[in-house]
């Protein structure tokens, strides 16, 4: 803050003449800087010693002295930011960057992307919003879910984009013949980010706390208890088989924090700073798997850069630019893919809405031009007719003779694309004689949504992680949507069917069972997918190892920068 005050005072001195020499009195300068004459003399002396200006006073009260400037405020700001970053004072650098968006873009350009700072390879990412606090358990945002996987470790993990779990804190595991006892063998050289050695008893304590969370208790409903059966072994004892257990433990929500320090993990990066305007990760020197190639990752929270009217390339949270978005020429698209995750529409059948009417609504969505004419940025979404690859939506005959209800209620939550979808659907149904009441739940999940009970139609999105089929099983088990969407008997039957599917030791049988469940939901017009996103990551030259993962981010441990002048 002291540097920012010095810069602001310098700008006040500079501004009246735009840097031209000035003939001015000490009294006028003090008034300009909102300070005493004594203080402005100190200010002039310090600025002159720093080489910013020259002040030639004339003897006698009220005499005009000569003020000459040697640096512009912009160059001084850049120098101050460089000095702040070299000394590890990221907060001071961000304070110095408090400018209008169009000026901020050009100012931040030299500092974003990959930089070697004090011989430390650092990657800086401008981001459009503050991040929610990190904690084990379910997290609403894609960025937070990705960060949880970089900061915390689990007993198992997904390696890259593989859908099969592999060892993490546990190097191997074994399952009893009846599927009711799972032994996880814990590595002997594990350390928390604070340097403490990880004890197996701590992992048991963290797991027990995690499973006490309501949503996590639902996910692990088959677990009877967890025991430390050896200093290097955790044993899960189940009351019914669950062959998804290793998958459940590998997902981001099952990562473990220190039982006494909830932000201390054991993943490849530790949290150094976590504040609304800055998040800094630093590599964990005692990480038990492959060490990161970067020393630090920083999120600079600069929402003003992401205003559509400014024309930045970071138009949407699924399109990440590592580096300053205004310099399109220097950024290159390094990775892109179509997400398996999707936005969806569900319909609650009731005396107000029959199955046949629900089918006609789904036909309207997929057979009309509705999805193809959404006024969204080109290349952002792709209309889909599959829930997952190979899980196609059903085809029904023309149902235009089926009368729609006179009135229906739609409730939807983020992402923002569903604003457009809701508006288009409301206008279309009005032309069909159906009045659609639209209610927006301003959140990323259905948690806490009071309007679900009265909704006929719901829209939201479903992120697909590393194991697509398993992720959908987790959705059916844990999302607040389904108890409101289905009748009590239908929901109980769904949960019993999921229990039967999870008891199949062969993964192909489990996948087939899940596909049958979702095929039934689509065939009975309860669920239909709408569109997928196009994930994109752009980076400036010299930032390497960037490869999209299933969450639309990239593994921070794989990114690297060549040394300067190499």
Listing of model-derived features with the role each one plays in the protein:
Residues 19-22, 41-43, 140-142, 172-215:
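Aromatic- and charge-enriched surface segment that lines or borders ligand/interaction sites
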Residues 66, 216-261, 266-275:
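Surface-exposed binding/hinge segments that line
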Residues 126-175:
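N-terminal lobe/hinge region of extracytoplasmic solute-binding protein
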Residues 286-328:
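Ligand-site clamp/hinge motif
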Residues 349-392, 518-526:
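Periplasmic-binding protein-like
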Residues 433-477:
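Periplasmic binding protein-like
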Residues 474-540:
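Extracytoplasmic/peripheral linker and loop segments enriched in polar/acidic and small residues
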Residues 539-566:
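Long beta-strand-rich cores associated with HINT superfamily self-processing modules
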């Amino acid at each position: 803050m002291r540097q920012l005050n010095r810069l602001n005072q310098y700008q006040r001195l500079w501004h009246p003449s735009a840097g031209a020499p000035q003939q001015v009195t000490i009294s006028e300068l003090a008034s300009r800087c909102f300070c005493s004459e004594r203080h402005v003399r100190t200010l002039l002396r310090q600025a002159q010693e720093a080489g910013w200006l020259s002040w030639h006073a004339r003897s006698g009260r009220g005499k005009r002295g000569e003020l000459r400037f040697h640096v512009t405020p912009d160059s001084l700001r850049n120098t101050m930011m460089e000095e702040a970053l070299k000394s590890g004072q990221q907060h001071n650098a961000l304070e110095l960057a408090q400018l209008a968006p169009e000026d901020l873009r050009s100012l931040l350009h030299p500092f974003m992307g990959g930089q070697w700072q004090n011989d430390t390879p650092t990657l800086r990412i401008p981001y459009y919003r503050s991040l929610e606090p990190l904690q084990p358990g379910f997290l609403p945002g894609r960025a937070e879910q990705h960060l949880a996987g970089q900061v915390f470790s689990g007993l198992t993990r997904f390696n890259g984009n593989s859908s099969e779990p592999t060892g993490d804190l546990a190097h191997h595991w074994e399952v009893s013949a009846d599927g009711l006892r799972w032994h996880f063998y814990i590595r002997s050289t594990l350390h928390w980010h604070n340097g403490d050695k990880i004890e197996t008893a701590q992992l048991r304590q963290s797991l027990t706390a995690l499973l006490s969370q309501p949503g996590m208790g639902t996910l692990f409903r088959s677990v009877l208890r967890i025991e430390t059966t050896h200093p290097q072994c955790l044993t899960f004892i189940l009351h019914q088989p669950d062959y998804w257990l290793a998958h459940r433990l590998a997902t981001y929500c099952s990562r473990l924090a220190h039982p006494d320090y909830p932000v201390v993990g054991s993943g490849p990066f530790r949290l150094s700073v976590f504040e609304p305007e800055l998040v800094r990760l630093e590599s964990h020197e005692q990480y038990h798997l492959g060490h990161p190639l970067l020393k630090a990752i920083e999120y600079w929270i600069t929402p003003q850069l992401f205003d559509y009217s400014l024309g930045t390339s970071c138009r949407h949270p699924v399109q990440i630019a590592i580096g300053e978005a205004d310099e399109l020429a220097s950024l290159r698209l390094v990775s892109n893919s179509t997400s398996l995750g999707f936005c969806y529409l569900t319909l609650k059948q009731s005396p107000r809405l029959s199955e046949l009417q629900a089918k006609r609504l789904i036909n309207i969505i997929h057979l009309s031009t509705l999805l193809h004419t959404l006024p969204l940025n080109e290349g952002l979404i792709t209309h889909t007719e599959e829930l997952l690859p190979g899980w196609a939506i059903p085809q029904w005959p023309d149902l235009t003779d089926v009368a729609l209800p006179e009135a229906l209620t739609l409730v939807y939550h983020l992402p923002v694309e569903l604003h457009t979808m809701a508006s288009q659907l409301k206008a279309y149904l009005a032309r069909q004689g159906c009045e659609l009441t639209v209610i927006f739940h301003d959140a990323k999940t259905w948690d806490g949504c009071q309007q679900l009970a009265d909704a006929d139609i719901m829209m939201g999105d479903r992120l697909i992680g590393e194991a697509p089929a398993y992720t959908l099983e987790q959705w059916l088990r844990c999302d607040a949507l389904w108890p409101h969407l289905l009748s009590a008997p239908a929901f109980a039957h769904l949960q019993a069917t999921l229990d039967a599917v999870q008891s199949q030791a062969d993964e192909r049988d489990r996948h087939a069972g899940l596909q049958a469940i979702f095929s039934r939901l689509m065939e009975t017009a309860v669920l239909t997918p709408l569109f997928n996103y196009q994930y994109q990551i752009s980076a400036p030259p010299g930032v390497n190892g960037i490869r999209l993962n299933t969450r639309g981010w990239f593994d921070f441990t794989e990114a690297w920068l060549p040394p300067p002048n190499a």
